[in-house]
Every structure is written in C-alpha cells, then in structure tokens.
UniProtKB/Swiss-Prot annotation:
DNA-binding feature ranges: 1027-1079
Protein name: Pol polyprotein
UniProt domain Reverse transcriptase: residue ranges: 167-356
InterPro entries named in the record: Aspartic_peptidase_AS, DNA/RNA_pol_sf, dUTPase-like, dUTPase-like_sf, dUTPase_trimeric, Integrase-like_N, Integrase_C_dom_sf_retrovir, Integrase_C_retrovir
Pfam families hit by this protein: dUTPase, Integrase_Zn, RNase_H, rve, RVP, RVT_1, RVT_connect
Protein residues bound to Zn(2+): 817, 821, 845, 848
Length: 1086
C-alpha cells in the first residue's frame, strides 16, 4: 500500500513524487492531539501510516523507517506508544516524523483505533493525470556513450543521483534497457554541484506534443483587482510521474569513480529537466488538475505560466487569503509544494518580469541603459536590444537603424560603430519607456486595435480608451510581402493576442479605405480575418506605389498578345534575350494582359514592361483602389506587382517603326511549333532533340514490340518534319525504336514503337526519358512537285521515339547515393546508368543540393606518387587533421584535441603505418616545424618540406580538400551518433565511392600505384637473383636420373618451371624432384 511521500526542505536537489492514491473529493481535515500538540491533519485512507512534521518526543523512539511510495523510498523517524486524541477518544498509536512532508496525515493505522471512517467520492480524481508520450515512428531511442568525467565531478554526481534515487525520482534500470543519454555536472556559485543531462538525441527522436500554452500571459489582459497573490510551485517537474512505457528511453549511466566498480544504470520516473516535453507535459498536467478548481471560483481572476500562479480578486482580504489557502491545500494533495518564502501578497507584485500596481503595470526593470557614440561589441549590443524587444509591448518603438547595425559579422566580439542617429533612436525609446505605463482591462468596454505604418515596421496599439493603451507592439518587415499584406498579417497577430489575453474579438482600425482592404483580402489568399473591422482616414503610406511610368533599372520586357492568323497567341521578348510565346484562347484584351502576367511571373524584382495596348497600359497605371477588380487576370497581375520592388510601364503606339515591338509582333504571329501535354521536356541548347517521357510503367516481354502513346500532341510548321529517335542508353541495352518519321503538318498524338531484342522482359518506369524528338527543316530539292501532293497514311497512328532502360540499376544507384552522396559521374560509372539519370539522382537529393562541393583549384603544386600534403582544419568547434596524397587525391583525416606537436607526431606515426609515404608538404605551423617533428620525419625517412609563407598555391590541394571534406561531413553528421563516424563515412565516400574521369577512385589509383611499385621492385629483385637447380623427370611415378644444372624460370609454392634442353620443352617439376644450387661458375663466365 502507498504512503504519502512528502517534499524535501528548501535547498534539497528535488522533491519527491507524491503517490497518486485515492482521496475524497474535498479531503477532510480534522483536529487531533499528538502527544501534547494539537494538529490539523488530513484524513487519508490511501496512507497506511500517520505522518507528522514535528513531534514533542513523547512515546518510544524505535529508529528510522523507510516508507515506500510511488515516488520511491523516503526515510522518517518512527515513534511507538504516542498518545493520540480525537474528540473524547484517546489511544496509543504509532507515528512517523517526516519534517519535509507538505501535509500532516492521519493514516489507516490509527483511523481504525479512533473509529474514524469516511465515505469516498470520485475515487480516481486526485491522481496526477499522466500524459502519454512516445518516440517518433521508427526511432529506437538514444544510444550515446557516457563520456569520461573527473573524479570530483563523479563524486558530485553520485551524491545527487543517490539523493534522487532515495526520493524516488530515478530508479535502477534493468540490464535489457540499453538506451543511454550522457550526464555531466557543473559547480554553481554556491559551491554545490548541479546535474545536467544532454537530452539532444532523445529530444530529436521524441514525437512532439501540442504546446499547452501559446506565449506568455500579459498583464494588459488582466482586469484591475483589489488584492493580488503570486504563488510559486516548487520542484514542479519532479512532482509529475513520467509515462511508464517511455521510461526505458531515459536511462543514463553513473560511472564508478576511478573504475573501482561496475557502472550503475538509472532511468527517470519523473519529468527530467532538459527534456523537451517536460514543459508541455507539466502544462497539460496543471490544466487538468486546476480546471475544476477554476470553474468553482468564478470570482477569482486566475493566471498560470509554468510554475508562477497569479490570483486576483475584489473580495475582502480575509476571504481572498482563505481562497489562496484553499488553492494551496488543493495543489498540495497532488504533492506540489508552494514555498512560503516565494509567496507574494499584495501590490507591487512581481509576475513574469512585470511589476503589477493597483492601477497600472510596468516592467520590473523599467529603465534602459544609455548608449553613447563610439564602438560596442556585438555581444553587448545584442543584450541591449534584447532588453528593449522585451519591452516593446509597452513602448512600441521600432529601432531600424540599430537593427541594421547588428547585421554583418556574426562573431560576438566583433565591433560596431554607434553614431548619433543610433543614440537618438535609443533615447526616444528610453524616454517613452520612462513615461509609459500599461493599463488593465475593463471587461465592460470594447477593445480596439489601431494599426499604423511606422518606420520600416508596423506598429499597433491595443486600447479601450484613447491615450490609455493596454499594450502596444511592433511587427518588423517580412521579406517578399507587400506592405498591405504585412498590415493584414499584423492585424491577425493583434487579434490573436487579444483573444488569448482577454478572450474578446477586438475592433481593428486599418488605415485607408474599406474597398482597398476588401480587394487585398481577395487577392492575398487571406484565410482568416476578424469580422469586426473598420477603417480610419489615417495614413495610407501602405500604398506601395511601385508601378511608375519612368524607366526603372532592370531588364525591359516587350509584350504582345492577340489573335494572330486566326489563332490566339501571347508572348514577350526581354532585353536579356529571354523569349516566351504560347498559343491560348481568349479576347485580344485578355491576351494582352496575359502577356504582361507572364512577363511579371518570369521577370525580376525591378523591370520595365512595354506594351502597345492602351487598355493594358491604363490598367497598369490605374490606382487599383478605384474599384473592386473582378477580372481574374487583373487580380493575378495585381498580386504579382505587389511582390515586386518596382515596375516601369511604357506604351508605344502599334508596332510600326519600333524595331523591338515589330520583333515581338512577328515572333508571336508565326505559326510556331506548339505542343499540348506533358510528354516532352524543354530542350537544352546543346541537345539535338527534345526528350520524350514515358507516361506510365511499361513492360515489354522478350522479343516483342509495344506501341506506347505519350501525353503529347504537336503542331509542326509547314516547313518542318520530325523524327523520333532512340536514346543510345536504351540501344546499348538491346531496346530499340522502330520507325519514327513525323510528316510536316501532322497534328496527331505521338506514339513510340519500341522493340525489346533481349531474351528477358524489360520494364520502362513512368517518367523516364525514353526517346527523343528531333526536328528537321523540310527540303524538297528535285522531288518538290511530288512532295506537294503527297499523302500521309498515318492519321492518328503517329510515331515517336525511344531509348530503353535496364532499370534495375536505378533504385540501386539511388539507395547507394542516399548512403554515400557520391557525385553523378561516380554513379554513372558504378551502376552503368546514363549520366543524365545520375545527375537527376544527385539533383533530387536535398542533402547534396544544400552542400555543394567547391570548384577545383588549379595550381602549380608539386604532385607525385607517395607525396602528401597535411594541414589542420576546423569544423564548428572541432579540429580535424587532414592528409591528402597529391597523386591520387586519397584523403586521411582524424579528429584531434588540439594543434600540439606531440599529438601531430602520434598521428604521423599512424599515417606512416597505414600508407608508407615518401614525402610530405605542410605549412609553417608550430606543430609541423618543431624540432622533434623534424627528427621524427628523418627517422621515418620522409622528405618534409614546408610551404612558402603567404603563398596559398603551395597548400592549394589540401586547402581544397578541407572544403570537400567538410561539405561531405555535413551530409553525414545527422546520420551518425558520433562525429568520428561521420568523418569515417565521409572518407569512404571520397576515397572509395568517388570516381574520377577515368572511372577510378582515389583508393583505386593509390592501390594501383603501390602494386606497380611492388611489381617493379620484384622484377628488379628477380633479375638480380637467378636460381639454378638439378631436376629429375618421373615416368609412371618412378624418378629418372638427375639432370642439369639449369636455370629456374619460375618458382611456385609446390613446383618450378624449367626448360629441358634436350626436348626443347618447358616442364613443370614438383619440388620433391628438385635440388637448388648456387649459380654454377661456368655459366657465370658465359
């Protein structure tokens, strides 16, 4: 049975978990006399022992007793034969003295003797509600080894962990719970140790919960109250049990000091500090616990954020305090402690960084420090600005110049220059802060939010009476949003703030005219806006007049559209050389506007548009708030224009006499090759044909033909014909296109006829480039007359082209690339897939697109077999020693602790043992030029040269290798638990998976060169060591006479080859029939 486990006194590491046992709905407290003292105790049928905080030492002490609760074991003092009196009844009973208990309890041991019984109600309600948490799909929990700690830290940790275990916060983990999270500790100013847990990996793998509370409560949302009390919940997290199925993932290891014994493994039973869900679980738990209490006390204004509780009321002071006590008792039932020393009664009260006064509120620290002209470090500037941003809800001042000053160099020690304009901006904020105070909310009155366009920011004021703001705020510019759209975003933010803080929907006052805003809401994809809004004749600075009739810096787009040769066409030609045209149905006016829309879509932030349509020109110039736009093309253009920085609009009459306008008119008037459908890809300038796309997965059995219609109709010009051709990558696999001429004027669907010549089925996947369409000019020559009257037999049975795929290798290449992120060339060579397919795989890999490789640095460095370069590089806070062999590009790298000579020499011996190098180039770093390093190089026989100072070319190869290595490591850091593993994976990619122009990897080249050296040395050695022997030939198993001497031409493990002079044949002789001898003298003299 469970015992009520209390809290430790102040200064303890953490409190105990209270047992979630059953209690009555309103737990009864009764007066009993224990020894000589009267006490108000909780009658608790869930506790089997009676607990008091203090005792007068009457009765018989029987030593210490361990109480087992859900939170673990707590020790108290046990006293027998203590006189206990309830009303008239006196008994002798047993009590436990536990000074840290939040409440004193009469347990079942003495209740029966005193004849006390209670009727239970809502039996399960006072358990602490458990919030379910889980890992993300497919995750297995953290497995990060505990790093070594000093003896002193281990002793500090042991003391903390022992205490946690005794109080039931942690438990001993069974051996099959294998997860591990590292722990460490720091010393506080008081000299006590504080335990820290590195939950980063567990946090990554844990499924998020919704935030229980969005943002801080704000005093502007509070009503004015006579009395106020602020309570602080002590050891909040450590009072809430952790969901049991999740506990195995929270294990940590307590190393034994000096390795004198085995490690001890623990797991968390309560919400640990530093775990990402502790705040959310805590908030959900408090919501559940307090919901009923808040509902029963409507006269109380109640606010909670994490462990700070605000209670405000207009009751008389005695009643107010009684309710506060009631709340404290209610929370204490669940084991939460409310330390007396942190309780604040009455004004001024400090809450969440605010200072609450009877009529107003202000910030606790409401003066900003001065800033003076001169230099300031970025670190100090960030702190100052942070101080101000916190207070913007009171003063609403934006500081664009100071914010601009923070841009640039990110190093905290980098310096910034404060000028007079910055000082003035800051002083304005200081003055405003000194003058202003916030007001409380009156629920009888409406709430207004007024928005205005300030200096590079939008400011808004929330008020009920003019001049008495509840709060104000600033929303800074959002890139790529027009100012009007930004004002709408600010209105949404303001409304959400008011709803969260006050629970009412505000009236929003917007600058300008109502019609403008109706239009903005229509074209801006605004999904939600408060229904109560109005406009005031204030500033209309939001009107971003970015359409002008002057020339703008930027390219010029000549646009045109209309019915040309009976067909709707539109397009543009830009001064940059970009051209665009398209067939589309529509009126002349619609097509003119569509041409402008396409130019706006494809043009930059600043551009010029030239049109010969007066209608389109007037539309672009018109003040768009004059009417509500109903034409969807106009609305789309307005949306595009709002997002531009500036557009110059120009009108020229007709197309006569103006070369550029004539050009665009002619360009869209041509009967041009038009297409319909998505079965074709745009052609690059260097390609002969257009790639055709397979519409769905197609299986072609061995030796069979398939006709594949693709999603494409084309309209060839009269002087064109086309051919559907095979792609060489398909032909090389035995898959061919049969036929494929498309006659001029043909307008049918393109079909590709494919023949599989293999003896097994071939699959062409959907979306694969599998044929190409080649356009040719039509030349009739002598056959022109016949050509005019020719007939095409094909009708709708048109032809297209192909190129087939062996396909099985594509998924293999994709899978291998997801592991090693090699380049397209390497995939192409390793898996025999076309270069374009390999490039597609790399382009679709998000990791590779984020981490582009550096371009090659070409220098005149010395390169050669077994000649290496070495240097240190830094990745975040880690140091890596990088070696590169200059001939093959083979890289060797390891993480090091520092750039010391001793560590470098240890690494040098490792490097030498692995690669047997001959020479080394480094810069003039102290580790490289130290005398012991030079002596080691001589000892190993390595020729060591140092770079030419300030000549980067001398180290170009290793410098480029740094960049390549770091880019590759970046791809692997998230895939591996340890950084060293990420380095190793990067080396596999760069040394083994990366193929060069000849299809060889750095490792291939390095091994080949080593083998060549070995063969060369062996042949040299063999030439200088001829061997001679006597031999005998066996006939039917019987050995013959000894013959010779003769030269051994080849020697194996069990036999040799010689040439028999008599037979003029080469013979293989077993070694048992051979006697080796030194080189005979007479042969030497020959």
């Amino acid at each position: 049975s469970n015992i009520t486990a209390g809290k430790q006194q102040e200064g303890a590491t953490c409190g105990a978990v209270r047992a979630p046992y059953v209690v009555t709905e309103a737990p009864p407290k009764i007066d009993i006399k224990v020894g000589t003292n009267w006490k108000k105790v909780l009658v608790d049928t869930g506790a089997d022992r009676t607990i008091v905080r203090y005792h007068d030492n009457s009765g018989i002490p029987t030593g210490r007793i361990k109480l087992q609760g859900i939170g673990g074991i707590i020790e108290g003092e046990k006293w027998d034969k203590v006189v206990i009196q309830y009303k008239e009844k006196r008994i002798e009973g047993t009590i436990v003295v536990l000074p840290s208990s939040p409440v004193e309890v009469l347990g079942r041991d003495n209740m029966a003797k005193l004849d006390i019984g209670i009727i239970m109600a809502n039996l399960e309600e006072k358990k602490i509600p458990i919030t379910q948490v889980k890992l993300k799909e497919g995750c297995k929990g953290p497995h990060i080894a505990q790093w070594p700690l000093t003896q002193e830290k281990l002793e500090g940790l042991k003391e903390i962990v022992d205490k946690l275990e005794k109080e039931g916060k942690v438990g001993r983990a069974p051996p099959h719970w294998t997860c591990n999270t590292p722990i460490f500790c720091i010393k506080k100013k008081s000299g006590k140790w504080r335990m820290l847990i590195d939950f980063r990996e567990l946090n990554k793998q844990t499924e998020d919960l919704a935030e229980a509370q969005l943002g801080l409560p704000h005093p502007g949302g509070l009503q004015k109250k006579k009395h106020v009390t602020i309570l602080d919940i002590g050891d909040a997290y450590f009072t809430i049990p952790l969901y049991e199925p999740y506990r195995p993932y929270t294990c940590f290891t307590m190393l034994s000091p000096n390795n004198l014994g085995p490690c001890t493994r623990y797991y968390w039973k309560v919400l640990p500090q530093g775990w990402k869900l502790s705040p959310s679980v805590y908030q959900f738990t408090m919501q559940e616990i307090l919901r009923d209490w808040i509902a029963k006390h409507p006269m109380i204004q109640f606010g909670i954020y994490m462990d700070d509780i605000y209670i405000g009321s207009d009751l008389d002071i005695m009643k107010h305090r009684e309710i506060v006590e009631e709340l404290a008792s209610y929370i204490a039932q669940y084991g939460f402690m409310l330390p007396e020393e942190k309780r604040q009664e009455g004004y001024p009260a400090k809450w969440l960084g605010f200072e609450l006064h009877p009529e107003k509120w202000r910030f606790q620290k409401h003066t900003l420090p001065e800033i003076k002209e001169g230099t300031i470090t970025l670190n100090k500037l960030q702190k100052l600005v942070g101080d101000l941003v916190w207070r913007q809800s009171l003063i609403g001042k934006s500081i664009p110049n100071i914010l601009k000053l923070m841009e640039g160099d990110r190093a905290l020690q980098s310096e910034r220059r404060i000028e007079l304009r910055h000082v003035k901006e800051w002083e304005e904020c200081r003055r405003k802060l000194a003058e202003m105070e916030g007001n409380y909310y009156d629920e009888e009155k409406d709430v207004y939010g007024q928005i205005d366009w300030g200096d590079k920011a939008i400011e808004y004021i929330v008020f009920q009476e003019r001049g008495k703001p509840l709060w104000v705020n600033v929303v800074h510019n959002i890139k790529n949003l027009s100012q009007s759209q930004q004002i709408i975003k600010a209105a949404q933010k303001l409304t959400q703030e008011v709803i969260i803080r006050i629970g009412k929907i505000p009236w929003i006052l917007l600058p300008g005219k109502e019609e403008d805003w109706i239009l903005e809401l229509q074209i801006g994809n605004i999904t939600w806006m408060p229904s109560f809004w109005s406009c005031y004749r204030g500033s209309i600075r939001w009107k971003k007049r970015n359409v002008i009739t002057e020339v703008v810096e930027g390219p010029t787009y000549y646009t045109d559209g209309g019915k040309k040769n009976g067909k709707g066409s539109l397009g543009f030609i830009a001064s940059t050389g970009v051209k665009f045209r398209k067939h589309e149905e529509g009126t002349n006016q619609q097509l003119e506007l569509r041409a402008i829309e396409e130019a706006c879509k494809q043009g930059p932030e600043k551009m010029n548009i030239v049109t010969d349509s007066r209608y389109a020109y007037e539309f672009m110039r018109r003040n768009w708030d004059e009417e509500v736009i109903k034409n969807p093309i106009q609305a789309r253009i307005m949306k595009l224009v709002h997002d531009k920085e500036q557009i110059g609009v120009h009108w020229v009459p007709g197309h006569k006499g103006i070369p550029q306008n004539e050009e665009i008119d002619k360009y869209i008037s041509e009967i041009f090759l038009a297409r319909e459908g998505s079965g074709i890809l745009p052609k690059r300038a260097e390609d002969a044909g257009y790639d055709l796309i397979c519409p769905q997965e197609v299986c072609i059995p061995a030796g069979q033909v398939r006709k594949i219609p693709i999603n494409l109709r084309i309209n060839l010009k009269e002087d064109q014909w086309a051919m559907v051709g095979t792609k060489s990558s398909f032909a090389s696999k035995g898959v061919f296109v049969q036929g494929g001429i498309i006659d001029s004027g043909y307008q049918g669907i393109i079909q590709v006829v494919v023949y599989n010549s293999n003896d097994k089925e071939v699959i062409i996947p959907q979306g694969r480039k599998f044929a190409q369409l080649i356009l040719m000019p039509l030349i009739h020559e002598d056959l022109e007359a016949w050509g005019e009257t020719r007939r095409t037999e094909r009708g709708n049975q048109g032809f297209g082209s192909t190129g087939a795929y062996w396909i099985e290798n594509i998924p293999l290449a994709e899978e291998d690339h997801s592991k090693w992120h090699q380049d397209a060339g390497s995939l192409h060579l390793d898996f025999g897939i076309p270069r374009t397919a390999a490039e597609d795989i790399v382009q679709q890999c998000e990791v590779c697109q984020e981490n582009k490789m550096p371009s090659t640095i070409r220098g005149s460095n010395r390169r050669g077999i077994d000649h290496w370069q070495v240097d240190y590089t830094h990745y975040e806070d880690k140091i890596i020693l990088v070696w590169v062999e200059t001939n093959s590009g083979l890289i060797y790298a390891e993480r090091v602790k520092g750039e010391t000579g001793q560590e470098f020499r240890i690494m040098t011996i490792r490097w030498y043992g692995l690669f047997a190098p001959k020479s080394l180039q480094s810069d003039n770093g102290p580790a490289f030029v130290a005398e012991p390093t030079q002596l080691l190089m001589k000892y190993l026989g390595i020729t060591h040269t140092t770079g030419i100072p300030w000549n980067p070319q001398s180290q170009a190869l290793v410098e480029r290798t740094h960049q390549t290595l770091k880019n590759t490591i970046e791809k692997f850091v998230s895939m591996f638990a340890s950084f060293d593993s990420a380095i190793a994976a990067a080396l596999i990619t760069l040394n083994i998976k990366r193929k060069g122009g000849l299809g060889t990897s750095p490792m291939d080249i390095f091994i080949f060169n080593k083998e060549q050296q070995r063969i060369q040395q062996q042949s040299t050695r063999n030439q200088s060591k001829f061997r001679f022997c006597y031999y005998r030939v066996r006939k039917r198993g019987h050995p013959g006479e000894w013959l010779g001497p003769t030269q051994v031409l080849w020697e194996g493990e069990g036999a040799i080859v010689i040439k028999d002079k008599n037979l003029e044949k080469y013979l293989v002789i077993a070694k048992k029939d051979v006697k080796f001898i030194p080189q005979p003298k007479e042969i030497q003299t020959e």
